[in-house]
Amino acid sequence: MANKNEPKITVAAENRKARFNYAIEDTIEAGIALTGTEVKSVRGGKSTIAESYADSRDGEIWLINANIPEYLQANRFNHEPKRPRKLLLHRKQINKLMGAVEREGMTLIPLKLYFNERGRAKLLLAVAKGKKLHDKRESEKKRDWGREKGRLLRARG
């Protein structure tokens, strides 16, 4: 049974390949500025953030290439599916993220798009560095060995 004290978070979109393709250094929660039809479309669960990334423009952080499809019940006031969306962060957080991206060769990758307990759309943003092919193979071997180890322990015990 679910605990009543746990916050109710509804995940709308998840970037599953991010943890495989990138070495994640740090995560930060950011708000996202959406229009009304975008919010309804995200609540419907049709949005994808798999090929998206965040970038800085004019001292702000923007989510680029996230696909939030048009809301079918909306009429002529619908939104553009792949438009850049502003991320809502404090100035200190923006400066920290921009510094990490410029100096250390990191990139900003969205991990999860969700609604928090107050119903606000949030984005879990990761400061990450791209993995090389041999790093991806190594993490895949570790994952396979963990699965195999679990199977062996279950078979014995």
From Swiss-Prot:
Pfam families from the entry? SmpB
The superkingdom listed in its UniProt entry is Bacteria
Region entry Disordered, spans: 133-157
Q: Give one GO biological process term.
A: trans-translation
- The reply on keyword Flavoprotein is no
The record's InterPro entries line, in alphabetical order, gives: SmpB, SsrA-bd_prot, SsrA-bd_prot_CS
Instruction: Kindly list the GO molecular function terms attached to this UniProt entry.
Output: RNA binding
- PROSITE patterns in alphabetical order: SSRP
Record keywords: Heme included? no
**Where is the protein localized?**
Cytoplasm
Cite the record's Basic and acidic residues compositional bias ranges: 135-151
Q: Which GO terms describe its cellular component?
A: cytosol
Q: Which keywords label this protein?
A: Cytoplasm, RNA-binding
**CDD domains xref list:** SmpB (cd09294)
Query: Which PANTHER family does this entry report, sorted A to Z?
Result: SSRA-BINDING PROTEIN, TMRNA-BINDING COMPONENT OF TRANS-TRANSLATION TAGGING COMPLEX
Task: Explain the purpose of this protein.
Answer: Required for rescue of stalled ribosomes mediated by trans-translation. Binds to transfer-messenger RNA (tmRNA), required for stable association of tmRNA with ribosomes. tmRNA and SmpB together mimic tRNA shape, replacing the anticodon stem-loop with SmpB. tmRNA is encoded by the ssrA gene; the 2 termini fold to resemble tRNA(Ala) and it encodes a 'tag peptide', a short internal open reading frame. During trans-translation Ala-aminoacylated tmRNA acts like a tRNA, entering the A-site of stalled ribosomes, displacing the stalled mRNA.
Instruction: Report the family membership.
Output: Belongs to the SmpB family.
UniProt protein name? SsrA-binding protein
Native organism taxonomy:
Bacteria, Pseudomonadati, Pseudomonadota, Alphaproteobacteria, Hyphomicrobiales
